[in-house]
Amino acid sequence: MTEPWNEIAEWWVETVRDDPRDSTDLLELLDELIGGTGGLTLDLGCGEGQVMRHVGAPIVGTDISGRLLTVAADAGPVVRASLPWLGWVRPDSFDRAVCIGVVEMVKDHRRLFSEVSTVVRPGGHLLVAMNHPVSTVPDSEPLVDESGAILWRWGDYLESGSLAQHVDGHEVVLYHRSMGALLEAAATAGWRLEQLIERGPSARTVARFPEYEGQEQIPTILGCRWTRDR
């Protein structure tokens, strides 16, 4: 997995800069979740450091791509590692973890929630902003009925699955889990849900991608804030 992410690092940096769904919209969602938290922060899947720069020090980033970490290192210390493994971190050493646009790229979400609960201290926080599960279902898509209303084809929403995107000959996979599956996995790992936010396409996104017009009430991003109970 490491080599593909290194090969498409430049594509990813440009995507983050150009697409409000991967940048401004998710950062604004993070801002709604982050209030009342603080301290030493772990940025999970930090990529080129967008979130590290937004949140500010003290923060440590981790990612699988050495090329992306070269850019992120300007924002703070970084560690090259493959999620969900966090064995390089001492237990209870972080006050909070942020995971922006990454949960859906990790195949083993249960292990991710479990590993993060080990490295964040009791009472600490996990802040997640991600593609909404409605939008990651294979074969899900908008539909227009006879009246012109835009509806949504759910596909096999309750079944776990994956979507593959091909970039310059490399495969980027998004893993689909239902909302219930995500929340159950987090709760099992000792995370207590404090806040959940759903958002449709922003005006900024609709202006950039006009095909989203009329879909503003269909959720595209999800934000969750958890506290570690144990």
Task: Give the residues covered by each predicted segment.
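Conserved class I S-adenosyl-L-methionine
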Residues: 1-37, 50-54, 68-71, 126-161, 200
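Class I SAM-dependent methyltransferase SAM/SAH-binding core
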Residues: 42-86
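A short acidic, Gly/Pro-enriched loop at the edge of an enzyme's catalytic core
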Residues: 86-97
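A short SAM/SAH-binding and catalytic strip from SAM-dependent methyltransferases
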Residues: 96-109
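A short glycine-rich, Lys/Arg-flanked "PGG" loop and its adjoining helix->strand segment in the class I
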Residues: 110-125
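Short alpha-helix
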Residues: 162, 173-196
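C-terminal lobe and adjacent flexible extensions of AdoMet/dcAdoMet transferase-like proteins
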Residues: 185-230
